[in-house]
């Protein structure tokens, strides 16, 4: 795993965006695996800025997202579909038909997961997968204890994840979806390149476990030590325990 040090969140975001933009420039018809949440947002803002300056072209890019809440309509302001459109897709020239997320509105979990796996395979797999990192080392919604050999699957959100996400639902955890569809560890590990972003002291223990701890399902991100082309971009606080 290659580690790139950043001074702060802004620097981390720029360095991560540099890696993503290099992938798009090198292979204009690449497949990007994308993530949601607070950590990748700055990188998306930087990509939009470069697009507006004429430095990036997304017209041939295909995207597949890591995860989506189960049971939320696409148009719900807290769906990951909405997050991605608000932060990236509506601001660049990506083709609508080239945007893929798990279908959170499909009540048949097995069917939703099967169809998403088929989409990922049909586009030729993922060239670059962007990941955030949970404080407990989770990637996507793959929580501690998840089997490494899973592809897209339906998960029950842990109480800690529901608690962490209630801030997006007016502080009311009753409004937070209790399940989600997520790419599995197997799918993530099949990406040709993986880019992990982490910032802040709250992520320091997870970063240490992911980089130098034992490879174990109890820290899902630790499997990335086995990936042949994984880059971690993190700020000084997130790297403070290394």
Spell out what each predicted region is:
Residues 124-148:
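Glycine-rich phosphate-binding loop
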Residues 33-37, 65, 102-103, 130-133, ...:
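Short beta-strand segments
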Residues 26-52:
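Glycine-rich N-terminal segment of FAD-binding domains in flavoprotein oxidoreductases
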Residues 1-32:
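N-terminal glycine-/serine-/threonine-rich phosphate-binding loop
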């Amino acid at each position: 795993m290659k580690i790139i040090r950043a001074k702060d969140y802004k620097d981390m975001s720029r360095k991560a965006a540099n890696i993503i933009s290099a992938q798009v420039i090198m292979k204009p018809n690449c497949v990007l695996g994308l993530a949601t949440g607070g950590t990748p947002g700055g990188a998306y803002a930087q990509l939009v800025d470069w697009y507006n300056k004429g430095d990036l072209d997304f017209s041939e890019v295909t995207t597949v997202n890591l995860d989506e809440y189960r049971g939320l309509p696409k148009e719900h302001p807290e769906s990951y579909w909405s997050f991605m459109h608000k932060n990236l897709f509506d601001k660049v020239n990506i083709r609508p038909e080239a945007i893929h997320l798990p279908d959170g509105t499909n009540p048949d979990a097995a069917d939703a997961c099967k169809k998403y796996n088929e989409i990922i395979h049909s586009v030729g797999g993922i060239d670059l997968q962007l990941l955030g990192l949970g404080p407990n080392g989770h990637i996507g919604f793959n929580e501690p204890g998840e089997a490494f050999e899973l592809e897209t699957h339906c998960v029950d959100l842990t109480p800690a994840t529901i608690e962490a996400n209630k801030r997006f639902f007016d502080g009311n955890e009753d409004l937070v979806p209790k399940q989600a569809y997520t790419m599995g560890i197997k799918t993530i590990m099949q990406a040709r390149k993986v880019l992990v972003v982490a910032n802040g002291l709250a992520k320091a223990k997870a970063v240490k476990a992911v980089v130098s701890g034992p490879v174990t399902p109890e820290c899902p991100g630790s499997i990335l030590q086995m990936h042949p082309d994984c880059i971690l971009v993190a700020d000084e606080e997130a790297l403070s325990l290394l």
